[in-house]
Amino acid sequence: MKIKTNYANTPVWREINVKSRIPESLKMLEVMARNIWWAWNDDATEMFRELDPELWRAVGQNPVALLERLNYEKLEALSVDKEMLGKINAIYDRFTEYMSVKPDKNRPSVAYFCMEYGLTHVLKIYSGGLGILAGDYLKEASDSNVDMCGIGFLYRYGYFTQSLSMDGQQIANYEAQNFGSLPLERVKDENDQPMVLDVPYLNYYVHAYVWRVNVGRVPLYLLDTDNEMNSEFDRSITHQLYGGDWENRLKQEILLGIGGVLLLKKLGIKKDVYHCNEGHAALCNVQRLCDYVESGMSFDEALEVVRASSLYTVHTPVPAGHDYFDEGLFGKYMGGYPQRMGISWQDLMDLGRINPGDPNERFCMSTFACNTCQEVNGVSWLHGKVSQEMFSGIWKGYFPEENHVGYVTNGVHFPTWCASEWKALYNKYFDKNFMHDQSNPKIWERIYNVPDEEIWKTRVALKNKLINYIRDQFRDTWLKNQRDPSRVVSLMDKINPNALLIGFARRFATYKGAHLLFTDLDRLAKIVNNPDYPVQFLFAGKAHPHDGAGQGLIKKIIEISNRPEFLGKIIFLENYDMKLARRLVSGVDIWMNTPTRPLEASGTSGEKALMNGVVNFSVLDGWWLEGYREGAGWALTEKRTYQNQEHQDQLDAATIYSILETEILPLYYARNKKGYSEGWIKTIKNSIAQVAPHYTMKRQLDDYFAKFYGKEAERFHALEANNYEQVKKLAAWKEEVAAKWDEIQVVSFNKCQDLCNGNVESGKDYKLTCVVDEKGLDDAIGIEQVVTYTNAEGREYIYAVNPMKMVKREGNLFTFEMIAGLSNAGSFKVAYRMFPKNDALPHRQDFCYVRWFNE
């Protein structure tokens, strides 16, 4: 027999998953790993790291993945390590004590809808500021014991991981998440099977798995369509954050809004207030309207109930930033809903239009949110004003400054963003109840009692940690992107821990103003190469994959950073995420922000830096317009000198250079014998004492309750009392007023001759009398005089609104009188308007019928 030289069959491989078998004495580690609580409790994070520091780094600081990969011998050794067990048990006791506290039932309950949540870098379901804010919000809701739940998506690929080519080109890498190794859990049905939510899309259903993230005491429910029950196209609905075309975006928003409400029903969850964090979630009110109509209400009655319990928070300052959908596309998926709500297709479209009845106007989610939510708010004082202007077309008859759009300035979750070194310092010198009273300025003023030297040592320690982190984490990246390793070594050597370190990190959109620093490269080169005042800049940030201008800006900065005069002085760090952000906001000396005014709705990165003794240098826009105090940071004025943006940029750049050269650098380097600048430490103390207490997430959450949640919940419960008796009355009253509105007549209107001629004297009062035929309505009309003036830019503003008093009634005739005058001389315009009035209305824009008259 001839022996073959090679004789083997093909192996039959079977994939098996081997998970760590956790000893009983370490079971509490699994419980804590599955709750995001560890992400803002440093001792818990450190506990997981100590289990296996090398593996902790290898798994990207993910405790779930860490426990899965710990080998059995390591686990057995830990299970008998008395010192480690003592530490684990102490932290677990604190965790269980925290979790045992029940929600405060004296405060309204809230359902919170958002497209993204930034909870930890481990869970890639966020892209930027909106998500970070939402994540911070849920964490603070947990810390503040609020009855809240979140609704969002579990993205298979999340937002992209950024890498940069040798020439600075951004490369977007989408890496699939392994859900089994993330800090979340499947929601099961009554048969202990994975829960499936069926969401109607006109002629078919999309099927979503449901996951739960435990954010301390707050549950966050995430929908996931990437399963075999769906078509290939529908599986991709939850593949990428803001991914795909406009059709996919609409599918996402249907799933978030309509699917989110269906999920709450399936889970048996009912809340007092439904909070749409951005317009992406606005369609939640479509499903809520359907539910109330199908329970027996008319559409108008259902709208009263839904509106009374809904809040819309807008985050964009420009109309182009809102989502608009063509009628054909919108009808493809939403065509069946009008019938369920008892209205026409035109009625539904008009709820999303500024100009109802205009067939050329697309459906806008933000307009729909404004029309179906009682309250609307921006995210800073200035953004509130910008939003009043932006949405003014929805409420015709009122000037922008009159409408009900309010604001709550964004804050940051202190335990998440404050470095452990600063927490230790605050705990040492502040009140023991500091964490429960973060918004109390008196407590923060105790920073003035902290020795200067201790603050300086804290700052130096964190700066060195950042520099070491950069050297460790980014050496491989730089080697990959540079042909010459010696150049990388040279770059590393040029990073100077004693230099003033300025950070600029955010989403790279052109309006964020990263280009300003590079307006005059010769002047910038002189600044960064001054041997007496060394300074270095750290940049980080991602540009949207479809934003060519933003990507071009990144490329330009990297090209400049590779020039000999800027090598090691300007550094761009790739893949900006929460992990890198925490290092930057605690490690740099100055946090710079230079957005185009007034396009920064709020901005919170500077607030995070503030908590870590980092001084802000920013345009007076967003939160810094409110936060800036002289001696507590530096600012560029909020006022534009030029309408031409290029000229304004040149002026702003020159101002930045000048402030750096004449104020910031001399102050930083005015060192005493102990090696630090007393003036610099004073600036740090001022910023912490005078600014920090006003920008915590605790303050933000309390503001939402004080300004919106409380009054909405109170009104909602009043409306639903006695089988919705008030709802029925109010809807009937509105219907009657609407039916008779065009018939109401101004029978007579008597003004003095001076007013008729348009010539009046300041300080002199005039009497006006107006008789109105209300056509059978019962004192349902208000009359007022509106006085306006025009400023130097040609913008018309309200000078005064003077109500006329109803003094007599004869049948349907109501007589109104007013005695008023103008105290200031000048040129004004005067007109009169009537409007429906009812104490049951939350504000005028809730029933926006207005008729102007002057004769």
Features from the language model and the residues they span:
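Catalytic cores of carbohydrate-active enzymes across secretory and cytosolic contexts
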Residues: 1-855
